[in-house]
Amino acid sequence: QRQMCIRDRATVYPITMGMASVFDDKLIEDIYVTVSDEGRAKFHDARRHGRYGRGNEGLTFWNPNVNIFRDPRWGRGQETWGEDPYLTTRMGVAVVRGMQGPADAKYDKTHACAKHYAVHSGPEAKRHSFDVENLEPRDLWETYLPAFKALVQEADVKEVMCAYQRFEGEPCCGSNRLLTQILRDEWGYKHLVVSDCGAISDFFYQGRHETHPDAATSSASAVINGTDLECGVEYAHLDEAVERGLITEHRIDTSLRRLLEARFALGEMDDDALVPWSRISIDTVDCGTHRRMALDVTRKSMVLLHNNGILPLDKGDAGKI
């Protein structure tokens, strides 16, 4: 589910860019322990009262955003940890650990999601048609991929979200190089890949990527190349894709198995009495302790800049930029 504070009550912390200013791994992990506490509390409370499925009660969180903020035209840059790959990596690992709980627990607390994989940094208007090409290999491996690699290998993130744009001619959600060669074969990722919302439609919609002729072909290509789950409607055409010989049921079963494994790992298929996380009270949501932590990190995130006579700019001396 998307972050709970969009349409429901929850403790609200500073935007990601603000928390990045703190550069405190332990504090960020502690913050996301409280976020996962509130997520678990909402999930079990909804199930007990017959409200589950109405929205904002799920256990998968599309967070953290570990893209690198390079283009100021990207209107969602404040969701990132900034332009520095190392800072982004350390903060991203802390988020995942706080969200997913102890590695040796019987059940995962929640599932975090590393997004948007990969090389996704705006501008926003072009993301459904843009092709990332001619990217220097050093920039790819030293700037854009380190955070994703660390979240997979160090934090064992349980979901990865593929991005909207193309990478070297292929939509990211259909990129064999990104999803199979790098993510699974090189980094050893074993878990679920989910598309960004509507990304599979971009494969064939007019005026977007137009790399595939129709929904069935697009869906088959996405699954074959590693996108297990779609946020959208096009995977409804997978039965047609099987009938046309574009994909086998066996390959679809591989993705289905990953999805079911994720749900079993969260304890969704078991009675709440068997899942220790179910004992987190709904009273923890937006509680005083969490509010005090939000105030603390807000204070620590403030950055003061000393103006040494630079501002306001003198029109006569500023020259051209």
Sequence positions of predicted segments:
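Glycoside hydrolase catalytic-domain context in secreted enzymes
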Residues: Q1-Q3, R7-I321
